[in-house]
Amino acid sequence: FSKQDSDISIQRVAFMCKLLARNGVAVFSAAISPSREAREKARKEIGSFVEVYVKCPLAVCVERDITGLYQKALKGDIQDFAGASDPFEEPLNAEVVVETDKETAEESANKIFQKLIELGYVSQTGAAGHVYSPEEEDKIKERLSRLGYI
């Protein structure tokens, strides 16, 4: 993608995240966003926003890449490839940074979950073992129905 294409894609993702969040849906979005400016615009658009920087050195990305796209980009066969033939601007103030070359997937997930607890987005105890009243169940079912899940 060109920088312009990438920025437009991030704008679309941000718009959808905003719509979902505005309607009470917890939204997780995984997007390659090489531009700090595009990420900041998304942050402003969405409002309630936690940036997770999944950090990985280029050499490790190349090693893990089963598609061969990084190699093609580094050879010049693919243009506009973020992090290889095009720059990737690292976030300056991401709420969470996971270093996938140093952490296990479980450690990274736990780091993200702990930050969400710290910021008040999720409860540490969760709802395990909670028994819902008939009224609570009705409210949950009504909401899921309105959202189109049931």
Predicted region positions:
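Flexible beta-alpha connector loops of hexameric P-loop NTPases
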Residues: 1-10
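Small-molecule kinase domains that catalyze NTP-dependent phosphoryl transfer to phosphate-bearing small molecules
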Residues: 55-58, 63-111, 119-124
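Short, highly charge-biased, low-complexity peptide segments
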Residues: 122-135
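Short acidic, low-complexity intrinsically disordered linear motifs used
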Residues: 133-150
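ATP-dependent NMP and nucleoside kinases share a basic, alpha-helical "lid"
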Residues: 2, 17-72, 80
